[in-house]
């Protein structure tokens, strides 16, 4: 089954083709992503209306490009998957409308995919994929969640942020210190040059039981430190390092607690912040110490992309799911409400025998 995946939940237009006849890395026949960073930079954040209009402009050219790179004609597709939520409603509707139209014209099934399930399943596209049960850390600009995955499609949220997501905290902290948009990657790059330990910030909510997160207080702590400093380039880098260390250590502590709570030893990390080098190194170190395993998607598949939507959609289409002819999107959508992936269980994909 060759499935076209369309991602348009926010400010990246992603398209990919996943082929279930193959496995591992080669199964991803082609993928392309167009980022709207330059479009939104002058506003310091994503403008929903501009995001929607840009998806309209970029989606069809990206589909043509991706099919060309995959060496496929459009009539060779067996299904179309699209992000149905959560996300910006206008942006979601663009992708859903194009996907449903293509599916109708080609007389193939279409399926709406949960954006965060796409992220969660992305590491399964790599060689030697993780097997359920495992714990997933979903960490991005809009979400920070710890999820127990008993089987593919069977999700229990163990903890989540009570305010800012980790990626959002990165972006807002960077903006407070005068770094350009998008701030998160800029702050992480700057932290590489900072002096460890000069600024030591709190590890929020790690001094009490529970698996929820909170980053708003940390953000305020950094703001106060910045305002009272000499605001030199050196100090900016040192504060960035202190902030990143605090976030990384907080995530690591909570991940280890979640593994203990779930009674498993495999951790999956996905979402845009999952590309952070310091986070990857810290979690790999923690996994080795406990004799466990941590799995990441390749960095290009950490940020929003069509590949994860094509893959998640392919699994659900194989399970017999498909959308009706109407265009449905769900801007707010609880992943725990998703149905189990029966076909994936039967085939052994991502589940222990």
UniProtKB/Swiss-Prot annotation:
Substrate binds at residues 138-142, 171, 184, 276. Its EC number is 2.3.1.234. It is found in: Cytoplasm. CDD domains: ASKHA_NBD_TsaD_bac (cd24133). GO terms for biological process: tRNA threonylcarbamoyladenosine modification. It is an enzyme of class 2 (transferase). GO terms for molecular function: iron ion binding; N(6)-L-threonylcarbamoyladenine synthase activity. Binds 1 Fe(2+) ion per subunit. One of its GO terms (cellular component) is cytoplasm. Keywords: Acyltransferase, Cytoplasm, Iron, Metal-binding, Transferase, tRNA processing. Fe cation binds at residues 115, 119, 304. Its cofactor is Fe(2+). Its main location: cytoplasm. Pfam families: TsaD. It catalyses: L-threonylcarbamoyladenylate + adenosine(37) in tRNA = N(6)-L-threonylcarbamoyladenosine(37) in tRNA + AMP + H(+). Belongs to the KAE1 / TsaD family. Required for the formation of a threonylcarbamoyl group on adenosine at position 37 (t(6)A37) in tRNAs that read codons beginning with adenine. Is involved in the transfer of the threonylcarbamoyl moiety of threonylcarbamoyl-AMP (TC-AMP) to the N6 group of A37, together with TsaE and TsaB. TsaD likely plays a direct catalytic role in this reaction. NCBIfam families: gcp_kae1 (TIGR00329), T6A_TsaD_YgjD (TIGR03723). This is tRNA N6-adenosine threonylcarbamoyltransferase. The gene is tsaD.
């Amino acid at each position: 089954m060759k499935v076209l995946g369309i991602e348009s939940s926010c400010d990246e237009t992603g398209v990919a083709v996943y082929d279930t006849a193959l496995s591992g890395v080669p199964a991803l026949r082609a993928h392309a992503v167009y980022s709207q960073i330059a479009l939104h930079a002058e506003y310091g954040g994503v403008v929903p209306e501009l995001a929607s209009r840009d998806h309209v402009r970029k989606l069809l050219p990206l589909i043509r490009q991706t099919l060309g790179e995959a060496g496929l004609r459009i009539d060779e597709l067996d299904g179309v998957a699209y992000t149905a939520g959560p996300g910006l409603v206008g942006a979601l509707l663009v992708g859903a409308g194009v996907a449903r139209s293509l599916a109708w014209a080609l007389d193939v099934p279409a399926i709406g995919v949960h954006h965060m399930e796409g992220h969660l399943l992305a590491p399964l596209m790599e060689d030697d994929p993780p097997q359920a049960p495992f714990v997933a850390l979903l960490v991005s600009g809009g979400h920070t969640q710890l999820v127990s995955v008993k089987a593919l499609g069977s999700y229990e949220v163990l903890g989540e942020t009570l305010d800012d997501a980790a990626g959002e905290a990165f972006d807002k902290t960077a903006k407070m210190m005068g770094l350009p948009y998008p701030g998160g990657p800029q702050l992480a790059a700057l932290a590489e040059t900072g002096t460890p330990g000069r600024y030591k910030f709190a590890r929020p909510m790690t001094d009490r039981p529970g698996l929820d997160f909170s980053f708003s207080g940390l953000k305020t702590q950094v703001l106060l430190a910045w305002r009272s400093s000499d605001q030199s380039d050196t100090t900016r880098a040192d504060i960035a390092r202190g902030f990143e260390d605090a976030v990384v250590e907080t995530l690591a502590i909570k991940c280890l607690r979640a593994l203990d709570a779930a009674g498993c030893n495999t951790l999956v990390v996905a979402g845009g912040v999952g590309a952070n080098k310091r986070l990857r190194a810290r979690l790999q170190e923690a996994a080795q110490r406990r004799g466990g395993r941590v799995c990441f998607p390749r960095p290009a598949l950490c940020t929003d992309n069509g590949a994860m939507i094509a893959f998640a959609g392919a699994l659900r289409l194989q399970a017999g799911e498909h959308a009706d002819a109407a265009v449905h999107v769900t801007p707010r959508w609880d992943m725990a409400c998703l149905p189990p992936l029966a076909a994936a269980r039967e085939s052994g994909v991502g589940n222990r025998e």
